[in-house]
């Protein structure tokens, strides 16, 4: 990358990232590391791992910022970085919550019935 292409994101509170490719590579790698600690059969791991690997491959393959933004379809790369940070936080919480384990007690029979 030949340097910063813009001076502002135009979004209040969201600063320009000077090294978006590096930042995204780090975040996606951290997400994948956390997902490794979740059982392979857990739906969250399966789908998040697939999406994260696809995005990481795009980041590694496309050096042009604008083209990468178009491929990722998540707005500006700074917005994609913010999304990746949120996904990393969620992955850590999912690991902590152990949502793949069975419920402590059975839900009420009509819990999902509507109208009651």
Swiss-Prot record:
GO terms for cellular component: mitochondrial inner membrane; respiratory chain complex I. The keyword Acetylation applies. The modification N6-acetyllysine is found at residues 30, 46, 60, 98. GO terms for biological process: respiratory electron transport chain. It is found in: Mitochondrion inner membrane. Coiled coil: none annotated. It is a peripheral membrane protein. Keywords: Acetylation, Electron transport, Membrane, Mitochondrion, Mitochondrion inner membrane, Respiratory chain, Transport. The modification N-acetylalanine is found at residue 2. The modification N6-succinyllysine is found at residue 98. It comes from the Eukaryota. Accessory subunit of the mitochondrial membrane respiratory chain NADH dehydrogenase (Complex I), that is believed not to be involved in catalysis. Complex I functions in the transfer of electrons from NADH to the respiratory chain. The immediate electron acceptor for the enzyme is believed to be ubiquinone. Belongs to the complex I NDUFA5 subunit family. PANTHER family: NADH DEHYDROGENASE [UBIQUINONE] 1 ALPHA SUBCOMPLEX SUBUNIT 5, NADH-UBIQUINONE OXIDOREDUCTASE 13 KD-B SUBUNIT. Complex I is composed of 45 different subunits. This is NADH dehydrogenase [ubiquinone] 1 alpha subcomplex subunit 5. It comes from Pongo pygmaeus.
